[in-house]
């Protein structure tokens, strides 16, 4: 397959899926979108509009099982992922799965076990920060060791507003899941425990939600990571990370772009949501995944990484309720992911 174009099927045509449809069609080389599956036919048709020969289906499994589909991008809600991932693994085709891998560690482990039984790493989880130039530079800086050993990390994850139906638990599973993955990826070690504190809540939070929250992550070597998660901050989208090391600090996610100076004031703009902030990361992620998928593999976060993130999320949700430090329950890493 490596010498011909990758025929991609997209499952899920919502905000993220439709964005990926445009990305694959316009900006990813060596790949073409041949099918879109979504229970909402009109939504699937909108995502496929203008793409010659792209078929639409209301049954996502038909996309995965189609003989002319070489690989799949999965952008449906997390609760639907497990059967779709298992179908892709059974067919032996690579799949890029938007986070989360699944909503809980037990179902994530079943996906891992299916891959282990197949003997191939076919599932890549869409943790796009690994492909962001700033985060990649931070990873290289920490790995080089010039700043000494990492001691602390401080993170902030802010959204202008949460969508309808967004819950406190989703602050962990849909938002802080990214910090769980970047912590493991940047530091190269597992998360051992999670704590959650609830400061004074914004008046903009919907009934039943405490926002913001402060999450503390503990790693195997003793590094502490603080995460401010604020999903109704009101002013825009920000993601920041500062690593505090023995010999210095390194920070990513600062304000950038054009600034203006007028009438005695200076200022700039804040991204309205995640898409402009991480467009380059999404493009790089999809391109590298497509290149790897043409050779039958992946190039990014594995199913095991998704399973480890799910275990950390479960500890985080438990800590939200109990207020106590909650250990992360994670099985031993299978040899396939060594």
UniProtKB/Swiss-Prot annotation:
<dbReference type="InterPro" id="IPR055170">
    <property type="entry name" value="GFO_IDH_MocA-like_dom"/>
</dbReference>
<protein>
    <recommendedName>
        <fullName>Inositol 2-dehydrogenase 4</fullName>
        <ecNumber>1.1.1.18</ecNumber>
    </recommendedName>
</protein>
<comment type="subunit">
    <text>Homotetramer.</text>
</comment>
<comment type="similarity">
    <text>Belongs to the Gfo/Idh/MocA family.</text>
</comment>
<dbReference type="InterPro" id="IPR023794">
    <property type="entry name" value="MI/DCI_dehydrogenase"/>
</dbReference>
<dbReference type="Pfam" id="PF22725">
    <property type="entry name" value="GFO_IDH_MocA_C3"/>
</dbReference>
<dbReference type="GO" id="GO:0000166">
    <property type="term" value="F:nucleotide binding"/>
</dbReference>
<keyword id="KW-0560">Oxidoreductase</keyword>
<dbReference type="GO" id="GO:0019310">
    <property type="term" value="P:inositol catabolic process"/>
</dbReference>
<comment type="function">
    <text>Involved in the oxidation of myo-inositol (MI) to 2-keto-myo-inositol (2KMI or 2-inosose).</text>
</comment>
<dbReference type="InterPro" id="IPR036291">
    <property type="entry name" value="NAD(P)-bd_dom_sf"/>
</dbReference>
<dbReference type="GO" id="GO:0050112">
    <property type="term" value="F:inositol 2-dehydrogenase (NAD+) activity"/>
</dbReference>
<dbReference type="Pfam" id="PF01408">
    <property type="entry name" value="GFO_IDH_MocA"/>
</dbReference>
<dbReference type="InterPro" id="IPR000683">
    <property type="entry name" value="Gfo/Idh/MocA-like_OxRdtase_N"/>
</dbReference>
<dbReference type="InterPro" id="IPR050424">
    <property type="entry name" value="Gfo-Idh-MocA_inositol_DH"/>
</dbReference>
<keyword id="KW-0520">NAD</keyword>
């Amino acid at each position: 397959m490596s010498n011909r174009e990758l025929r991609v099927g997209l499952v899920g045509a919502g905000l993220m899926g439709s964005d990926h449809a445009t990305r694959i069609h316009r900006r990813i080389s060596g790949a073409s979108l041949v099918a879109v599956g979504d229970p909402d036919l009109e939504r699937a048709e909108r995502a496929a509009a203008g793409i010659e020969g792209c078929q639409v289906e209301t049954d996502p499994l038909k996309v995965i099982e189609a003989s002319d589909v070489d690989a799949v991008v999965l952008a449906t809600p997390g609760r639907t992922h497990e059967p779709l991932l298992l179908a892709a693994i059974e067919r032996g085709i690579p799949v890029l799965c938007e986070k989360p891998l699944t909503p809980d560690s037990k179902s994530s482990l079943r996906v891992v076990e299916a891959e282990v039984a197949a003997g191939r790493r076919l599932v890549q989880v869409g943790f796009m920060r690994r492909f962001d130039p700033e985060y990649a530079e931070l990873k290289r800086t920490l790995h080089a060791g010039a700043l000494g050993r990492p001691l602390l990390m401080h993170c902030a994850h802010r959204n202008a507003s949460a969508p309808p139906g967004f819950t406190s638990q989703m602050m962990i599973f849909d938002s802080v899941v990214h910090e769980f993955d970047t912590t493991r990826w940047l530091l190269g070690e597992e998360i051992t425990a999670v704590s959650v504190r609830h400061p004074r809540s914004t008046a903009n939070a919907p009934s039943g939600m405490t926002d913001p929250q402060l999450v503390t992550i503990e790693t195997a070597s003793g590094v502490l990571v603080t995460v401010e998660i604020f999903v109704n901050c009101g002013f825009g989208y920000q993601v920041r990370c500062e690593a505090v090391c023995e010999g210095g600090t390194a920070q990513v996610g600062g304000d950038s772009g054009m600034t203006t100076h007028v009438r005695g004031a200076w200022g700039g703009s804040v991204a309205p949501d995640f898409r402009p902030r991480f467009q380059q990361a999404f493009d790089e992620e999809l391109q590298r995944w497509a290149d790897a998928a043409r050779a039958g593999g992946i190039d990014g976060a594995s199913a095991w990484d998704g399973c480890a993130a799910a275990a950390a999320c479960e500890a985080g949700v438990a800590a939200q309720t109990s207020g106590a430090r909650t250990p992360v329950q994670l099985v031993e890493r299978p040899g396939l992911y060594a």
